[in-house]
Amino acid sequence: CQFGVNFEDYLDTGLFLDHRPIRLMIQQQAKNKRFLNLFAYTGSASVHAAIGGARSTLTIDMSNTYLDWAKRNFDLNGIRGDHKLVRADCLQWLNEQAGAKHKPQFDLIFLDPPTFSNSKKMDEVFDIQKDHVQLIHDAAALLAPGGKLYFSTNFRRFKMDQGALKNLLIEDISKAMIPEDFARDAKIHYCWKISR
């Protein structure tokens, strides 16, 4: 996969290097799958899914800047087909879809929310520790039978409330998702595989 990166005028480059293993795993699992990327940033996980043969991808982020960047990343890789970019508040979108009578279904979902957000574009303040249970429940409601949800956070003090999520199968895969060049910082992010 090829990605446009920025080394000039942003604090971020457009690519989270520590997420290489999860993106590669998504690519390897994506063949003929319907992929949903929430809080998608520049869409790199969606590009990996498309390169891996995903039947469709839906890339959702609140920022037009990042969605334009995601489109450039798709174009850079010559990706065509059923790959949609949607500007939306992911929390509101998820809540609406999870409560819908006819829910969309996805075989693979990547959920990598911010630790905290009080964006003017959002209806409410978001705190990953306080809000992760509802967020994961809503995302899991969109899983097709046999589907997998990958949830990641870089909040160093994060604690998964497995008691409140006991109706889901949750596996901590954090150790396997830390690339070798980040191994000295094992808390760079946490990652779980979740299914119903």
Residue ranges and their predicted role:
Residues S63-L108:
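S-adenosyl-L-methionine
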Residues Y66, R87, D107-D138:
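Mobile active-site "lid"/loop adjacent to the S-adenosyl-L-methionine
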Residues I79, L143-A144:
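Helix-to-beta-strand junctions that scaffold the AdoMet/dcAdoMet cofactor pocket
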